[in-house]
């Protein structure tokens, strides 16, 4: 099975490397305006495959995306230190206007997996440009924020993060919503589990975890310029869900007819992901405060997309 990645920068190359380690694809094609960069990353990653799985990693052109089951869109300009994801919008929408038609010309049946920030608005841009059904344009959304939330809860509770079920919804960015009210550990409500574990969550603990999730990207960008390992692993996991028709539930971004009264907006909700992309949405139970926060997040994203005409 073939997977394409458009954009061979830090996120695109990290995704290709994660795919090689997972071994879910048989061929990964890197496409970039800088052909030497794509070739260098492809060659370097190919040399890792003897230690992992037999994956053919190569650089190519848009035409080489023919037959791809999924294409990751990681093309765009990098986020600057202190720059919000929404501030990237004007600079990256123009990139997609060139990229999306060329991808679909070569791979008209592919699921488009959007990684470029601000990812929720760029998902809406890609959806409008593509003319595809909403489910076939999937943004990485808050998968990484959700992973951070679960990891920090697990660290506090001293349990495996795989046993923590908690979501971050809405924008992948400043207005994201951490859903505390329905969080569970091993099927037990979070606060009940924390008490039984002797690791009660004080207001200070909650504030620390909230800050840890919400500000993680800014801290990483300040320290090393960009985030790529975490999101690369997350994108590879989404590709695996598509290629294997997994039907797992992930907090990915997709065009949504209505969210808390806000119409036609792309944002993250728990969604069932399979071979055709998003196959359904699982709307979680929310507290009144979380519902209002999700509505505000949806409005922010709606306004940003509307300003561009999308």
Curated annotation (Swiss-Prot):
Its EC number is 1.1.1.27. PROSITE patterns: L_LDH. Allosterically activated by fructose 1,6-bisphosphate (FBP). Pathway: Fermentation; pyruvate fermentation to lactate; (S)-lactate from pyruvate: step 1/1. NAD(+) binds at residues 11, 32, 62, 76-77, 115-117, 140. The active site is at residue 172. Its main location: cytoplasm. GO terms for cellular component: cytoplasm. It is found in: Cytoplasm. Substrate binds at residues 79, 85, 117-120, 145-148, 227. Beta-D-fructose 1,6-bisphosphate binds at residues 150, 165. InterPro entries: L-lactate/malate_DH, L-lactate_DH, L-lactate_DH_AS, Lactate/malate_DH_C, Lactate/malate_DH_N, Lactate_DH/Glyco_Ohase_4_C, NAD(P)-bd_dom_sf. It catalyses: (S)-lactate + NAD(+) = pyruvate + NADH + H(+). Disulfide bonds: none annotated. One of its GO terms (biological process) is lactate metabolic process. The modification Phosphotyrosine is found at residue 218. Keywords: Allosteric enzyme, Cytoplasm, NAD, Oxidoreductase, Phosphoprotein. One of its GO terms (molecular function) is L-lactate dehydrogenase activity. NCBIfam families: L-LDH-NAD. Belongs to the LDH/MDH superfamily. LDH family. HAMAP family: Lactate_dehydrog. Homotetramer. Catalyzes the conversion of lactate to pyruvate. This is L-lactate dehydrogenase. It comes from Thermus thermophilus (strain ATCC BAA-163 / DSM 7039 / HB27).
């Amino acid at each position: 099975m073939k997977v394409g990645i458009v954009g061979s920068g830090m996120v695109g190359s990290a995704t290709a490397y994660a795919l090689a380690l997972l071994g879910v694809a048989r061929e990964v094609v890197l496409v970039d305006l800088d052909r030497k960069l794509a070739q260098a990353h492809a060659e370097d990653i190919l040399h890792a495959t003897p230690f992992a799985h037999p994956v053919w990693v190569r650089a190519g052109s848009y035409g080489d995306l023919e037959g791809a089951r999924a294409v990751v869109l990681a093309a765009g300009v990098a986020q600057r230190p202190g720059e919000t994801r929404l501030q990237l919008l004007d600079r990256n929408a123009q990139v997609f206007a060139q990229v999306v038609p060329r991808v679909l010309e070569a791979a008209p049946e592919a699921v488009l997996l959007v990684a470029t920030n601000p990812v929720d608005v760029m998902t809406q841009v890609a959806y409008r440009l593509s003319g595809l059904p909403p489910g076939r344009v999937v943004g990485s959304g808050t998968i990484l924020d959700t992973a951070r939330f679960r990891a920090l809860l697990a660290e506090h509770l001293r349990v495996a993060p795989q046993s923590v079920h908690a979501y971050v919804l809405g924008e992948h960015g400043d207005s994201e919503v951490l859903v505390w009210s329905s969080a569970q550990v091993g099927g037990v409500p979070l606060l009940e589990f924390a008490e039984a574990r002797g690791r009660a969550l004080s207001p200070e603990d909650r504030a620390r975890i909230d800050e840890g999730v919400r500000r993680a990207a800014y801290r990483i960008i300040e320290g090393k310029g960009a985030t790529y390992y975490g999101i690369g692993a997350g994108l590879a996991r989404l590709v695996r869900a598509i290629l294997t028709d997994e039907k797992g539930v992930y907090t990915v971004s997709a065009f949504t007819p209505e969210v808390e009264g806000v119409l036609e907006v792309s944002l993250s909700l728990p969604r069932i992901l399979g071979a055709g992309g998003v196959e359904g949405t699982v709307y979680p139970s929310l507290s009144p405060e979380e519902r209002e926060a999700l509505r505000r997040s949806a409005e922010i994203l709606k306004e940003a997309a509307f300003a561009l005409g999308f």
